[in-house]
C-alpha cells in the first residue's frame, strides 16, 4: 500500500461535495423541512477498515460546518443493508437511494466508460492516479454519468489499497492462477484482467463471497487489504499475494 495522506484527500473531496449538496435550491428546500438522505456502502460500519464510514463521517462534518446540520440529515447504511451494490447503483440512478460509496467499477455496469479506470496495471499508485484526475482524466467520466445515468460524482477518493489476490495457495505468477476460480466484481474489464492473468475469473455479488470461499465454490478473491480484513475473508484463505493489478478509485 502506498504511503499517502488518504484522510486529507477524502476531507478535501468531501468539502467540495458538501458545497455541491448545499446549493441554493437545496438550501431553500432544507429551510422548509429537514432533508433526509440515505448513503449506502457494502462494507461494515468500521472506520478502521471501511472506506464508506470514513467518507460518511467527513460528509456529515462538512454539512455541519456549513451550518446545515439541522436541515440536512444523512443516514448511513453499511453492510449492504439497502441491497447489493449492483442494485443500489440502479436505485441511485432512479433516485430511490440518494448516495452510495463504492469503487468506480460498480458504476461501469450502467455507464461503461467508467470502466476505463479498471484496466489492469493502468496506474502504479494512487498519487499517480490523483495526478491524472487533477489534470482532467475524471471529467469525461463525470459528464457521462450525469448525462446517461443522472448520477453526479460529489467526491473521488483513494481506496484503502490496491487490489490483489487472496487465495488458498500463494500466487507467484500466472501459472499459480491457472484454473483458479477467483471472484471478481461483476465488471467485464476486471473479469477480463483476471482471465488474462491466468485465473478462471468468476463474477459474484459481494455479499456472497464469504460463503462461496468457505464452501470451496471459489478458490480466492481479488480485493484491497482492508476489505479482506473487514469482511474476514482471511478466515477462509490464507495467502494474500500482492499482485497490485488494480488501483481503481472510490466514488461518492
What is each PLM-predicted segment?
Residues 2-129, 137, 143-252:
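N-terminal secretory/targeting leader peptides
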Residues 133:
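Short, flexible helix/strand-to-coil boundary loops that buttress conserved ligand/catalytic motifs
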Amino acid at each position: 500500500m502506498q504511503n499517502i495522506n488518504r484522510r486529507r484527500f477524502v476531507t478535501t473531496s468531501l468539502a467540495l461535495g458538501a458545497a455541491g449538496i448545499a446549493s441554493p435550491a437545496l438550501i431553500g428546500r432544507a429551510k422548509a423541512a429537514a432533508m433526509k438522505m440515505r448513503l449506502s456502502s457494502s462494507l461494515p460500519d468500521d472506520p478502521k477498515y471501511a472506506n464508506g464510514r470514513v467518507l460518511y463521517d467527513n460528509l456529515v462534518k462538512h454539512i455541519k460546518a456549513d451550518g446545515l446540520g439541522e436541515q440536512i440529515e444523512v443516514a448511513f447504511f453499511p453492510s449492504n443493508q439497502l441491497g447489493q451494490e449492483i442494485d443500489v447503483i440502479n436505485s441511485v440512478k432512479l433516485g430511490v437511494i440518494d448516495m452510495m460509496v463504492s469503487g468506480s467499477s460498480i458504476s461501469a455496469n450502467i455507464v461503461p466508460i467508467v470502466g476505463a479506470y479498471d484496466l489492469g496495471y493502468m496506474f502504479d499508485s494512487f498519487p499517480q492516479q490523483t495526478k491524472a484526475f487533477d489534470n482532467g482524466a475524471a471529467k469525461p467520466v463525470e459528464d457521462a454519468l450525469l448525462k446517461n445515468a443522472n448520477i453526479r460524482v460529489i467526491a473521488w477518493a483513494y481506496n484503502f489499497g490496491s487490489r490483489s489476490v487472496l487465495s488458498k495457495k500463494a500466487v507467484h505468477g500466472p501459472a499459480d492462477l491457472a484454473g483458479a476460480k477467483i471472484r471478481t466484481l461483476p465488471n467485464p474489464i476486471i473479469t477480463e484482467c483476471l482471465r488474462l492473468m491466468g485465473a478462471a475469473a468468476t463474477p459474484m455479488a459481494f455479499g456472497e463471497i464469504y460463503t462461496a470461499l468457505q464452501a470451496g465454490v471459489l478458490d480466492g478473491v481479488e480485493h484491497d487489504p482492508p476489505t479482506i480484513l473487514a469482511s474476514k475473508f482471511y478466515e477462509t484463505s490464507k495467502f494474500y499475494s500482492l499482485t497490485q493489478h488494480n488501483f481503481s478509485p472510490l466514488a461518492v
